[in-house]
Amino acid sequence: MIVLNGYDILAQIYESVNSEVYRAIRTVDNQPVMLKILKQEYPTAQQLTHYKQEYKTICGLNFEEAIKAYGLETYRRTPVIILEDFGGISLKKWLEGKPLPLREFLSLAPRIVANLEKIHNAKVIHKDINPANIVLNPETGQIKIIDFGIASVLRRENPGLKNPNVLEGTLAYISPEQTGRMNRSLDYRTDFYSLGVSFYELLTGQLPFPANDALELVHCHLAKQPLEINSLVKEKIPPVVEAIIRKLMAKTPEERYQSAYGIRADLEECLRQLETTGKIEDFVIARQDLANQFQIPQKLYGREAEIATLLTAFQRVATVDKNSSHTELMLVTGYSGMGKTTLVREIYQPITEKRGFFISGKFDQFQRDIPYAAVISALTHLVKQLLGESQPQLQLWRQKLLKSLGANARVIIDVIPQLELIIGPQPEVLQLGAIATQNRFNLVFKNFIRVFCSPEHPLVIFLDDLQWADLASLQLIELIMLDGDMDYLFLIGSYRSNEINSTHPLTATLDKLEQGGIIINQVILKPLGPAQVNQLIADTLNHSPEYVQSLSALVWQKTHGNPFFVNEFLKTIYWENWLFFQSGQETTTKTDNNRGYWQWHLGQIQRIGSTDNLIQFMMGKMQKLPPETQEVLSLAACLGAEFNLYNLTVISEKSPSELLPILTSSSEAGLIILLSELDEQLLIQEYKFAHDRIQQGAYALIEDSQKAVIHLKIGRLLWQHTSVNELSEKIFKIVDHLNLGYQLISEKKERESVANLNLLAAQKAKAANAQAGALKYIKTAQKLLKKSSWKNNYQLTLNIYSEATEIAYLSGNFEPMQRWANLVLKQAKTTLDKIKVYEALRYPLC
């Protein structure tokens, strides 16, 4: 029992893995209260964040049925939330696993829905609806929903792909999309699924999916249907009541109810029939269900054959069969906006069934010289998934990794620093010659990948936007795919077919793979047809395809069926109020729903000019944003497809509190996506642009004459805010920005410092066997040197040209190698200074 000054503790009434709840009396006014406190003596930063967010969220719920928060106290090292005590008991404890009689259920359920409706109207998504968080006062009948620890105040979230052991929410109740394995963002309808599971449990006394294993339970939410309610209870449950619960528990949000009003209307109709006639007849459910929020369905239209091709290929890879290969390469191609990335993520569900790993990385259009950028990003996500495993499982992975990597584990840690969290600090590797270092890197990297490829855990690697891949990454793909010992690996690459020609490095890589006997499968995505656009718009507006025919024909004509363009076009006409929700009773002739329907101004929409240029279209949209938002998004675009709040505060010279409203509104508008959870300051730190074309549109807002100036400023600020210990990890991003504006650097000392940074970047790229990137960095280092540098900064100049000689050799550029070697031999002051060049010149050329 805790002791908290100012409160008389009466009893503990609830205990979970993380928290305890006590009944108490506040001594100053004898007010009954509840105290919610974390159990851990030393709470994690994430737990503290959830508590602060819960208190803040509850304080923002200004309606009678909301639980009230009276204050936030501190007990030792943990916060204590002071909540009202209205004499309630959780439905979980009240029922004690017994089924609730139908009449009592129908008396409670509409009030629970009404409470949830008010929470949603306050723009809060609860994300943890379950009977333990629904509290009833049996005497007064008052119902309140509690526990807002993971609630979201955002209209939409993008849950990442996580280990099931670390998912937010109560696993038995979370929606398929909340698992992060459904290829879609999360909105208020996640609570409807959890509500459906809760209603199922209230009526049956059982959970719909009584699995114990976390991954198995996730798979049940994704793919399995629960037993019929009437097969589990003695009391006959009317089919329409079960139909309501089934609709709530639909696997995709589009198939569920779209409004709490619609759920409540159907439940109240059931209760009305039961009270007036003693029975419940069937009726068409969801007739009063209509969302007045504008939401474009996230499901794919017209891609059934392509999805089947992808899933069949994965099944081949994951099936244990000694007579067939278990490594495949699949290329997904098409113009920008065709939905290549979205299509690939449809593979989440079967991967979960096979207990496989899915990792992805994306090449950045503005940072093409960073070696292995997408590969490292993908493998870093894999390491993070492993860190969510239980300690015994993590120990098994540690043993596998150390056995496979041996004395060379440091090679991988230098590329993926987070791996050290699993295998611990590792000694530096032996220094070898350049060719031997290359060979070691290739061998160790292949061994590292093989650890995760097994029949128990097939591995899917998705590399997005291969048209922007660096040469080192393409060579690594070639290395992995031609490895005869690699099994249970499914490598998927996507690229824009209109940006690849016969001279592109990707073409050469694919030619080599075909010559090596690798079968390259391909999915080509084409624009949507008029019928598919018609169905998408009909689903969006909850109308029949016939009713929206005139609008959909115009949208198809304007967008040529490009899925991204269709979505953005619909958002544009909605923002312009040319597509709007008309409420009122007079609409009953249009639909069965008397709450309203969607209308549009066809003439206004017709005036929008047609364009095939998506960048121009997005740029036009962004120019309508407030100037401050345009500035922030254009700076974010300079940082990359993904960016973080810290770097944005540095380069914009704005505080987090100034940036937060801008980023939140941009997220609400679908321009950027949130990648991380709230931190201890209740800030989101990680973001990404929702699409490449949005990033390009934001970048295009910057005048061409100012781009070099801005990149130079970004490079300087990032460099200034990077410690010596962090420099190696951030070197490529810093140098890439500086190099875009290096010609504007006039001061000799700064030019030499930036030249030295390029030297460090070249050395790191060379060590990672990324010789093409290393050559670019070393050439820029040379350009930054003054003609008198051999005289005025001898050591730096010697280091740059000696390194250049070796890199030129390793990359097969023998003409500049000889030229730079001769220069070093001419300018070097001692024999010792010439050794590195002599070694390069003596290397065998075969």
Q: What annotation goes with each model-predicted range?
A:
Residues 373-460, 508-514, 518, 528-538, ...:
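Conserved Walker-type P-loop NTP-binding/catalytic site
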Residues 172-276:
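C-terminal lobe helix-coil module of Hanks-type protein kinase domains
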Residues 42-60:
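AlphaC helix of the eukaryotic protein kinase fold
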Residues 114-124:
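Protein kinase catalytic-loop region centered on the HRD/HxD motif
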Residues 76-90, 94:
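Conserved short submotifs of the Hanks-type protein kinase catalytic core
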Residues 108-109:
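Activation segment signature within eukaryotic-like protein kinase domains
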Residues 287-295, 331-338, 343-349, 377, ...:
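Short secondary-structure boundary elements
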